[in-house]
């Protein structure tokens, strides 16, 4: 696992913004709607607390199928760990299956207060997209985060725009829009470090991408 200093690898739960907004398969959703949707799909278990990921398959997945999916995720994790600027962690989705959380430090992806991807970040996302294309039976969820500098409104907009920049770039590299099931900006509502220090604020500025088994992968594993 690569450690780039300012990179953060955990997702904490905070109150949902009443102005929160995001995108679900291309459509905009408000904070309340996103919260309701997340509750309906199911919340990520373990380190992710509150991030709704995983196909809503509605049935229990057997141990054998779960083990097969775990092996596939472990293989992809090894691929992703070679990407500059990406920190990869195994988490558990709402179906109890292994999933991956890939955290990109916003300092690597974007210039300060900008949502346009840098040339360096595009090189990393090119490799990330290749891994997604080679593992097509997965869904992708993207969250943007900021530190607490500035107003809630400004940070909400920037966090969403950054998440959407990653979404749009991945789609430009051949990732089908239907695979990206949720894109949301969370502003500074889910800090992973103190915003009282420069180091903490840097850790809080990040984009998180979750990779989880879709229904096809689950069906094939059973």
Model feature map: region roles:
Residues 22-81:
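Short, low-complexity, glycine-enriched hydrophobic/amphipathic alpha-helices that associate
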Residues 73-101:
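Amphipathic, membrane-active segments
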Residues 109-143, 171, 202, 209-210, ...:
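Periplasmic peptidoglycan-binding/anchoring modules of Gram-negative envelope and division proteins
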Residues 145-220:
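Periplasmic OmpA-like peptidoglycan-binding domain that tethers envelope proteins to the cell wall
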């Amino acid at each position: 696992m690569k450690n780039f200093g300012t990179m953060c690898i955990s997702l904490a739960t905070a109150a949902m913004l009443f102005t929160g907004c995001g995108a679900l398969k291309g459509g905009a959703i408000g904070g309340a709607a996103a919260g309701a949707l997340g509750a309906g799909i199911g919340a990520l278990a373990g380190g992710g607390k509150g991030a709704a990921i995983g196909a809503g398959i509605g049935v229990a997945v057997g141990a054998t199928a779960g083990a097969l999916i775990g092996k596939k995720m472990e293989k992809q994790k090894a691929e992703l760990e070679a990407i500059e600027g990406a920190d990869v962690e195994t988490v558990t989705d709402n179906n109890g299956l292994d999933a991956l959380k890939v955290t990109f430090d916003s300092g690597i992806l974007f210039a300060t207060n900008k949502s346009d991807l840098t040339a360096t970040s595009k090189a990393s996302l090119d490799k990330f997209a290749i891994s997604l294309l080679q593992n097509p039976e997965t869904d992708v969820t993207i969250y943007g985060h900021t530190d607490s500098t500035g107003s809630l409104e400004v940070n909400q907009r920037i966090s969403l725009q950054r998440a959407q920049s990653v979404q749009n770039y991945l789609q430009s590299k051949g990732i089908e829009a239907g695979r990206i099931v949720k894109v949301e900006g969370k502003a500074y509502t889910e800090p992973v470090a103190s915003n009282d220090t420069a180091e903490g604020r840097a850790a809080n500025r990040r984009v998180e991408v979750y990779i989880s088994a879709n229904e096809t992968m689950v069906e094939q594993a059973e």
